[in-house]
Amino acid sequence: RRSSDLPLGTLEWHGPHMPLGADGIQSKELFVRVAEKVGGVVLPMLFMGPDRLFDDRGTVFYGMDINTEGALNTYCAQQMKGSAYWMEKGLFQDLLRSIFAQLSRAGVRIVVGHGHGPSTNAFQEMKEEAEEKYGLCIMTAWTYADDERLKYQNDHAGANETSIVMAVRPELVDFGQVKEDESNLIGIAGRHPVRESSEAFGNEILEYTMKTLIAGIEKEYKTIKER
């Protein structure tokens, strides 16, 4: 089948309990499972991506360096340990254009991209351009997902993402790294990752996403064949 899956990763702080590469790990694990069902090539993950940025007199903060609405705990702006991924959105989309051009040249017709939230949004914004200029149908793991509770990677290191990693790479989740007073549980948006995460919830998210994404890919294949 002429489809490719692009994990939109980052090297980004995901709390003390999760790996820096959590975004790409989650999307890659999803894509490998989907490709086993419907075919396709899982591409190497990206680790750079766009995000909000604030320059405070030469000190640059981006992403979860900055306290945001929905953050689990309020905190002062700080450079989160290990985060090293920021790329200007326009440059990121230029990179995607180059990827689209090469995949189109190779005969790919469908590209699924997912991972880091701002990267996923920037990818999806290019849907019309990808179709008109490169003859590609692009989609994300959210395109055919209607259940907000089960949308894949719909928070930042909260109960959703933590549960997914517990399901796909359980050895990478270590709640023992969270201090007893939870003072290092910052840079997290979503429901409480320690109290509300579970492997069972992660598997529920994974199974729902696989079902909806596979159905979407099959639908697009049918549309392409009928053209």
Segments and roles (model prediction):
Residues R1-R227:
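Extended, histidine- and acidic-residue-enriched regions that form the cofactor-binding/catalytic faces
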